[in-house]
A protein has these predicted regions:
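Hydrophobic faces of transmembrane alpha-helices in multi-pass small-molecule transporters and flippases
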Residues: 2-10, 120-124, 147-154, 196-199, ...
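Generic alpha-helical transmembrane segments of integral inner-membrane proteins
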Residues: 6, 10, 14, 18, ...
Length: 281
């Protein structure tokens, strides 16, 4: 069971690396803009994975007790939380992205800000693909079907790798979309992974059935999910990137004012460090 999880983590790390490789061919400013999106992207992933960890903790107990009715209720409440999370990130995608980049860039380079707003807005507004992907993958993991979780991530990553050059550079009749193309390719890859994971759940995950007939949110279940989720949430925000994640925002405000190339070098090193960390895990 551990090998599929290791491959899944490696594939997740490759998403950012592949995007960076193709975006770097556009310009230095394009890669800098994408790198500046890391803090909010980390927040998005932390919320999604944290909720998944909380859901898995409750599901494991219920499935161990063969209490499938309660397991279905837990899964339905978790799905409700993912929908609520998407609504929050949808609103943030429309409201916070421009102030977020402006707080880092000031008036240093408007092209970087323009690229960044295009990229991050697309990723956050259409984050339903990522949230659905992680939700269905966590359901598969909770019942030990990690091979299907790995398969869904591979499908999403391969889709992203194929679409990145096509949408960024305008190949095969597709209009040249630049940085926006990288974001669209990522979103499509996430949606493909979500569809594959959802299909695998429907066909193979017989222990858990999502049922929203007469559904009512359960405050106790939701509270317990977030009780366990907060540990993973803090891990993703603090431990995995500590101390670089918090310094990243501060450094970007300085380096983008001085010269983009210094910040670009730092961002590239951080991407490789993330890859090495996932590989070691």
């Amino acid at each position: 069971m551990s090998l599929p999880m290791m491959i899944s983590m490696l594939v997740q790390a490759l998403y950012n690396i592949v995007d960076s490789i193709f975006v770097a061919k556009l310009s230095e400013n394009a890669l800098t803009a994408v790198s500046l999106a890391f803090p909010l992207q980390t927040l998005l992933i932390a919320v999604a994975t944290g909720t998944g960890v909380g859901m898995n903790a409750l599901l494991s107990k219920s499935l161990g007790e063969h209490n499938y009715k309660k397991a279905n209720k837990i899964a339905s409440n978790a799905a409700f939380l993912y929908v609520c999370s998407y609504i929050v990130f949808l609103i943030l995608g429309f409201t916070i992205v421009k102030p977020f980049y402006k707080s880092q860039m000031g008036n240093a380079d408007m092209q970087i800000m323009e690229y960044g707003i295009e990229y991050l807005s697309t990723v956050m507004i259409f984050s339903f693909g990522l949230l659905a992907q992680i939700f269905f993958e966590r359901l598969l993991t909770s019942t030990g079907r990690t091979i299907f979780s790995m398969t869904s991530q591979l499908c999403g990553a391969i889709t992203n790798i194929i679409l990145d050059p096509i949408m960024i550079f305008g190949l095969l009749g597709c209009p040249r979309m630049g940085v926006t193309g990288a974001a669209v390719a990522t979103v499509i890859g996430q949606c493909v992974a979500a569809i594959v994971a959802g299909t695998c759940n429907h066909k193979f995950n017989h222990e858990i059935k999502l049922d929203f007939h007469r559904f009512r949110p359960d405050a106790h279940i939701i509270g317990t999910i977030y009780y366990y989720a907060v540990y993973r949430f803090c891990h993703d925000l603090l431990h995995e990137q500590n101390p670089h994640r918090f310094l990243f925002y501060s450094y970007s405000r300085i380096w983008c004012i001085l010269q983009a190339s210094e910040f670009l070098l730092y961002a590239s090193i951080r991407s490789e460090q993330r890859y090495n960390t996932y590989y070691c895990l």
